[in-house]
Regions:
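AMP-dependent adenylate-forming
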Residues: 60-69, 86-112
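Conserved AMP-binding A3 loop
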Residues: 109-114, 246, 253-279
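Conserved AMP-binding/adenylate-forming core of the ANL superfamily
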Residues: 96-133, 137-146, 150-154, 171-179, ...
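Conserved structural elements of the adenylate-forming
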Residues: 117-125, 235, 249, 268-288, ...
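Conserved pre-ATP/AMP-binding loop-to-beta segment of ANL
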Residues: 95-98, 233-257, 264, 288-294
């Protein structure tokens, strides 16, 4: 860790608290981070500082957004600041603060930032048991919004498994197209719509299926969520820190598909650089949003807005996200 830069970062935090922060100080600090250090921990500390609303508003009001963002993107890349490090960082910063209020059966179930990260690590352990010596799994999600599907998505993004959320409004032909093109090896299925879609195409696909619920209704090679999640105890060699250090920044991490209303669905690829730089860019574009705000998850997480702005955006800002299951599922 670069002690000189760490002291400068601490000084900026003090300036924020006393409302004495200046844009010139921030520019000097980010330039120093770029020119002086390659230490990941120091750069990550700076990137944590950079999501502060006071910092964002200072840069925004000084009309330095473009210059600032270009430098941030540079630091994100050279320090390998991917989704896993972002989630770990928010867990440390916001700790017991609630990240999700899940409305279920007229009751609100809460998940804290610290608990979310613990659940993601446990889910990562279970996912690691799907690996074989000659095969790295590609994960598909065919489900309505629910906590367990979020855990799968975020664990894949944190530890490097490619993950593909599939639109529930797909036709069976389009579902088959997506499964074949993306080479999904393991499909997590949930809800009535997801079950119906999978059962229609199951005879022509050799894919392992994990059921979020109602596994008896699914055709094919199916295991329950409970069985899958219990497998984490078999992941003796899973090391979250080591796994995160291997995640590449500029390779395809996830694919999101269009609805395919005019032809076959179009797959849009995203790298970790795409995912993380977009969070900082969105933060700079919306300087009034801060950790005291609440989000409502009203779009499906196979939709870019629902997944990136509502889910990942709320986590980036340190907000509270309200969500409830689809009434149809």
């Amino acid at each position: 860790m670069d002690s000189t830069l760490q002291n400068q970062i601490k000084k900026v935090y003090s300036d924020i608290e006393s409302r004495k922060i200046r844009a010139e100080t921030l520019i000097d600090l980010i330039n120093n981070c770029i020119q002086i250090t390659l230490d990941k921990e120091t750069i990550h500390s700076f990137l944590d500082l950079a999501h502060s609303q006071t910092v964002v508003q200072t840069i925004y009001n000084a009309d330095l957004v473009t210059e600032w963002l270009e430098k941030l993107v540079n630091l994100i890349d050279i320090s390998q600041f991917h989704t896993g490090y972002l989630l770990e960082q928010r867990a440390k910063r916001y700790n017991k603060k609630t990240v999700f209020n899940i409305i279920r059966d007229e009751t609100i179930h809460t998940v804290s930032y610290a608990d979310l990260w613990k659940k993601i690590i446990e889910t990562g352990k279970a996912l690691s048991t799907l690996e074989k010596a000659d095969e790295f799994p590609t994960i598909g999600l065919l489900t309505h919004n629910q906590l367990n599907s979020v855990l799968i998505d975020l664990a894949c993004l944190s530890f490097g498994w490619r993950v593909i959320p599939i639109p529930l409004n797909s036709t069976s032909e389009h579902l088959s197209f997506i499964l074949n093109q993306s080479e999904i090896s393991h499909l997590f299925v949930g809800g009535k719509t997801g079950i119906q879609l999978w059962n229609k195409v199951q005879p022509i696909h050799k894919i392992s299926v994990i059921s979020f619920s109602d596994s008896e209704s699914l055709n094919g090679d199916v295991i329950s969520w409970e069985t899958f999640f219990e497998s984490r105890y078999d992941a003796k060699n899973f090391n979250a820190v080591q796994r995160m250090s291997y995640v590449p920044m500029n390779e395809t991490q996830t694919i999101m598909y269009t609805s395919g209303t005019t032809a076959n669905p179009k797959g849009i690829t995203f790298t970790q650089m795409n995912l993380i730089s977009k969070r900082f860019a969105r933060g700079l574009a919306l300087p009034e949003i801060n950790a005291n705000d609440c989000f409502l998850c009203y779009l499906p997480l196979f939709h870019t807005f629902g997944r990136y702005f509502e889910l990942m955006g709320s986590i980036y800002w340190g907000c509270l996200l309200y969500t409830s299951p689809s009434p149809r599922d």
